[in-house]
Amino acid sequence: ADSVGFAYRGDNSKVTVHKQRTCASELLDRIEVPQTATQLLVHVRDYTKGHPRVLPNNHPIRHGAVVGIHNGTIANDDELFAAHGIARAEPCMTVDSELIFALAEQFRGRTAHALERLVGSMATAWLDEGREELLLARGMGRPLWIGTSTQELFFASTRAALDVVEEYSSLKLRKREVREGSVLVVNGGRIVGRDSFRPDMSFEERPL
C-alpha cells in the first residue's frame, strides 16, 4: 500500500480525517475512533494518479464539505474539472478521485446524473458535511459489497472483507453486491434512498 487512512463523523456534521503513509497493519494499530462516531470510512491506497508524497492526494480525500474514498481510475478528471469550472481543493492535488467528490458537492442531491460523465472504473463512498447520510456508488469495473444487520451497514470491495467484519463483530450480515450504475443513500444503518445512472462502459482498465 502507498497510503492508508480513515474518516469518521460523530454526533455533529463535522468529518474528521486521518491519513498516513504506512501499511494497513500499522493503521489498525493506531486507529482511534470515538464511541460517538456513527459513520466510518477506511481506505488502503495503491496509487495510479496523484503521488502519495502529496498528502492531500491520499484517501480519504476532502473536497470542500465532502470527504470520500474511491477504488478505481477516472480517466477524464482534468477534462471535467475544466468543463464544470471547478478548482482543485488544493493547488498541489492531482489525484483523479477528487473529481467524484467535487461533483458530489457541486451537484448535491443530483450526483447520480453527474456521475454519468465519468470515464473510468469506480466503487466509492463519501460523507458530506452538508447532509447527514453516507453515500455509496458503483460505476463499472470495480466491485462494491454491502453487509447489513438489524442496525448496521458495512461496505467493502469484496465479500471476503465482509466475512472478516462478520467474524470479528459477531454480527450476522446479509451480504450482497451493489449493481453497476447504483447510488445508495444510507442513514442509521439502513438504505433510505436509491438512485441510478448509466456508467460509460467504454473504459478498459490496464492492470497495475
What residue spans do the PLM features occupy?
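Conserved short alpha-helical segments that host acidic/polar catalytic motifs at enzyme active sites
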Residues: 1-208
